[in-house]
Amino acid sequence: MKVDTLEESRISDIGHAFGYYDYGSEHGLIDAFPSRDAAAAFICGYVRMALLGGLLHTTSEKGEAYIAYKRPGEKLRLKAVLPLAKGLLGSMSFGDLMRFARIMAKGEPGLDKRFDKEKKPYLFVGMVCVRESYQGQGYMRKVLKLAYDEADRLGVPVILETDAQSKCDKYIHLGMELAGTRRFGEHGVLYDLIKYPSAPRRSESSSRRDQE
């Protein structure tokens, strides 16, 4: 279901789930931020942007899990982008911001940029979050299905990027394919993932005709 309004406490829950994700021995691009709180504040800004842009969806009214995705051709208005800029600028000093920019500049263009260059349509997933109290209960599969079903309806692939091998493995388990990796020096790796649209389900009458 599409999310039109969201309490600040729920936005904070999402930010905390991202900012305090357990990377284990991995670095993750969380290292590009000056602190875990700064990463959480940036994600909160992203959630507000997705909310204003009409990109945010959830599994149910309980809000167990959230996903933000952009369909082919959808554009964000400046008003929607401002919360993301505020979240980024408000969470870092000028020096931290310059360091963040230098780290992000080390990576190659992502799969979405390659699709843009080739003028290929796709559905881009910018955020997937299962709130911490609902993790380990199958909600990641349920929330991803929202994007998968919409992409199948449109006949386009789903594209997503993540910054940890542990996350990448979960997405592959849930139907995505690893399309490539991008290294950001010693600060981590981004994994580009894709799920191609499922073949349309054939009707029983069509199957019977094929057998005649």
Please identify what each model-predicted range represents.
Residues 1-16:
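A short beta-loop-alpha structural element at the N-terminal edge
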Residues 33-56:
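Active-site rim helix/loop that mediates acceptor-substrate recognition in acyltransferases
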Residues 52-70:
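Conserved beta-hairpin
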Residues 66-129:
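Conserved acyl-donor/pantetheine-binding loop and adjacent beta-alpha core of acyl/acetyltransferases
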Residues 122-123, 150-163:
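Conserved GNAT acetyl-CoA-binding A-motif
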Residues 126-135, 159-169, 185-186, 196:
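Conserved beta-strand-loop-alpha-helix junction that forms the acyl-donor binding cleft
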Residues 130, 136-149:
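Conserved acetyl-CoA-binding loop-helix of GNAT-fold acetyltransferases
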Residues 141, 153-154, 164-181, 185:
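Conserved active-site alpha-helix within GNAT-family acetyltransferase domains
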